[in-house]
Amino acid sequence: MHAIFCRRVAVGCSSPQLTKLVTKQASQSRHSLSHLLPFDLSSRFVPPYVVSRSARVHGFFAGKLGNTNLKLKFGNVMESRAGFFSSELPSHGFESGGFTGFQKRGWKSWINGANGVVFGLVIANAAVFTMWRVLGKDNMWMVKNFMLSRYSFMTGRIHTLITSGFSHVGATHIILNMMGLCYFGARIARSFGPRYLLKLYFAGALGGSVFFLSSHALSVISLKGQRVVPKDQLKVPIGKLGANGPVYAITLLDMLLYPKVTTYFGLMLRVPVFAGIYSLGLNIIKMLEGKNNNTLTSLDQLGGVVVAVIAWARIRKGRFCY
């Protein structure tokens, strides 16, 4: 309808008016398309008066926009940069996962991570192992504070119940224990939280120490019954070292919770975890029958096994806390 109306108006006009109307429309169309063409083409096809008029208009708006652009460029450059980076890297997400959040929360955020608590336990064991290497195996300060014995316990060094669980002398001993801690401890921490892993580690160390002292006390009582008393009995250099109790507690709890999961045994054979429970059972039977030569290590392991069974029973009944 609009096109028909325009045609009727155009036909109804006189010839001079029609000529002016066509010329005006052509100039407007050329002016609207002049910015799309190169400068030489626009100057070639557009009349000079149209070009000069458009240049004046363009100069007016360019001056206004240029001043605004300068203000934005020099006055608000930091705000524009901040807006750009905020769209790429949100401040909330970066703070929660970057170094800023770590600096604000400190060691609490680090210890709350599953891998962080495992790494911390490994570092603690490695530090005590280094102290044994530097100070020597015969250093009395290390023996009194990082080895559990009847002498250290009777002289009031109760902290050796826990510190002996971080103490290793042999390189093979610490490597095997830390491998088990990293493999099974990380899964326990992810399932129940890092605090639960710490509690389980300390409970395993305490359980192994209690079993060691109980066995030592029973052996002394039996010797007294047979009237065989060693000279200076309090200073008998029989002590407990190593994280066998904590590692056995963590390993066996993981096996009891996930018995059908397959894992690498001896870093070579992929076998079900339940086979590890069978191997631990044979070890305990040999120890009870007196066929195991290293009775002190087996007692430490037995303490960890008891702690794992108690923890597994509490988990099944829902009586555990993170």
Curated annotation (Swiss-Prot):
Transit peptide boundaries: 1-52
Cellular component, GO annotation: chloroplast membrane
Topological category with respect to the lipid bilayer: Multi-pass membrane protein
Membrane-crossing residue ranges in chain numbering: 110-130, 166-186, 201-221, 238-258, 265-285, 295-315
GO molecular function annotations of the record: serine-type endopeptidase activity
Disulphide bridges: none
Compartment(s) where it occurs, according to its Swiss-Prot or TrEMBL record: Plastid, Chloroplast membrane
Major localization listed first in the record, in broad terms: plastid
UniProt-listed InterPro entries: Peptidase_S54_rhomboid_dom, Rhomboid-like_sf, Rhomboid_protease_S54
Keywords: Chloroplast, Hydrolase, Membrane, Plastid, Protease, Transit peptide, Transmembrane, Transmembrane helix
Record GO biological process: proteolysis
Taxonomic superkingdom: Eukaryota
Pfam families in alphabetical order: Rhomboid
Family recorded in the similarity comment: Belongs to the peptidase S54 family.
Physiological role: Rhomboid-type serine protease that catalyzes intramembrane proteolysis. May cleave the plastid translocon component Tic40.
Official protein name in the record: Rhomboid-like protein 16, chloroplastic
Annotated organism of origin: Arabidopsis thaliana
